[in-house]
């Protein structure tokens, strides 16, 4: 006996499938609307916009008002046109005069500095980033007019002692490299004002000789392996900004109030259980960012709304990422994550500065997904 075929009215079957199709289309429409309204989509849009503005050198204050970002394309075009107009109105020889004293290098095809550089000892500023350069040559001591050494995101594993010969150096940025130590001779750069050693991951201490740097106002040693605030940092009497986040701190020194000029103190992503009462003596402190996961004791006056201090306690809830088998890949992934975290916090802190008050609490959630 063959298969028994039951024939229904075809119009009934068609109506059934048309209903299913309509429901599916309605679901698709709702899903599109949900994604458009999704916070993740909004975050993605805003961060892409912020990245584009930063790439074009547009100040945050222009596109961020009261904590909200205007992501309209018209605004971006308008800002870009105004920027180009201002640039075109500048004297034509201004850029040429400045570039004659500036050296710039970027790109992974660079594994060492060009030989011709040693002949250009008149240079005052170096901007070298995203290269595979591992060594800064000793002939750097010849650049006596050097003011700025901006060397982030390379593969520098060693700084020569000769860097101490740069008596006019004001800014040193060696963030997100592979440094495990800083030469004591850097303490001879008595005019240094900014020091950024963030994101080297393996850096554990700073030499005591850096105590001589009395003009330093900015120190960033975040994303390393410091177990305590370096003694030399406590002796930088003009320090205004200290970022020691993402390290291994479990406590702060009782004499932290030596930093009388300190205005911004970033301590989040450590394992601090308490804050010393000497923190109350930092009369100029206006921003304090900590991780509240382990914090159980702190001076209540720090949270007093009548003070100008903005106290931010982050609750960090990381989602474990899948571990790579290759140790180098793990290290690179950690370096990239730390860099991204810093960019997020930088934008958040810039926004905080424009607010009259901070949220009563903030939860920072780390996650990894494809947007």
Curated annotation (Swiss-Prot):
One of its GO terms (biological process) is intracellular signal transduction. InterPro entries: Leu-rich_rpt, Leu-rich_rpt_4, Leu-rich_rpt_typical-subtyp, LRR_dom_sf, LRR_domain-containing. PROSITE patterns: LRR. The keyword Repeat applies. Signal peptide: none annotated. LRR repeats lie at residues 122-143, 145-166, 168-189, 191-214, 215-235, 238-260, 261-283, 284-305, 308-329. Pfam families: LRR_4, LRR_8. Gene3D superfamilies: Ribonuclease Inhibitor (3.80.10.10). Keywords: Leucine-rich repeat, Repeat. This is Leucine-rich repeat-containing protein 2. It comes from Homo sapiens.
